[in-house]
Swiss-Prot record:
Family the entry assigns: Belongs to the Wnt family.
Disulfide bonds: C89-C104
GO MF annotation list: cytokine activity; frizzled binding
Protein name: Protein Wnt-3b
Post-translational modification summary for this protein: Palmitoleoylation is required for efficient binding to frizzled receptors. Depalmitoleoylation leads to Wnt signaling pathway inhibition.
Localization terms from the record: Secreted, Extracellular space, Extracellular matrix
Superkingdom of origin: Eukaryota
Gene: WNT3B
Lipidation (O-palmitoleoyl serine): S1
Length: 123
C-alpha cells in the first residue's frame, strides 16, 4: 500500500479593508507632476516630471497626478457638483458622513427635532 499526499495552493484576495487602507495611503502620498512637451524627431512628446524637485522622484509603484481634484465642498455647475452646504452630517462620526469632513471646515448648525408619530402599538 502507498500513501498519497495532495497539496493545493491558491491566491486569496486580501481583506477589502486592507485594500482600501493601502489605496488611501497611496492617495495621501501621491506626487504632483508637471506635463512637459518637447520636440523630438518623431514629433511632439509629452513627459511627466515631479513638480517639486525637493522631493524624491516617484517610483513605478507610487501614485502620481497632474491635475488637482475638484473642490467637492463648493458647487460647480460645470462638473455637476452640488457641494456640501446644507447637507445633513453626523456630529459623532469621524467617517465620511462626519461634520468635520463633510462641512469642509465651515462649521455646522445643530438642530434638535421633536416628532409625534403614531406608533400603532398594541398592548
Amino acid at each position: 500500500s502507498g500513501s498519497c499526499e495532495v497539496k493545493t495552493c491558491w491566491w486569496a484576495q486580501p481583506d477589502f479593508r486592507a485594500i482600501g487602507d493601502y489605496l488611501k495611503d497611496k492617495y495621501d502620498s501621491a506626487s504632483e507632476m508637471v506635463v512637459e512637451k518637447h520636440r523630438e524627431s518623431r514629433g511632439w512628446v509629452e513627459t511627466l516630471r515631479a513638480k517639486y524637485a525637493l522631493f524624491k522622484p516617484p517610483t513605478e509603484r507610487d501614485l502620481v497626478y497632474y491635475e488637482n481634484s475638484p473642490n467637492f465642498c463648493e458647487p460647480n455647475p460645470e462638473t455637476g457638483l452640488f457641494g456640501t452646504r446644507d447637507r445633513t452630517c453626523n456630529v459623532t462620526s469621524h467617517g465620511i458622513d462626519g461634520c468635520d469632513l463633510l462641512c469642509c471646515g465651515r462649521g455646522h448648525n445643530t438642530r434638535t427635532e421633536k416628532r409625534k408619530e403614531k406608533c400603532h402599538c398594541i398592548f
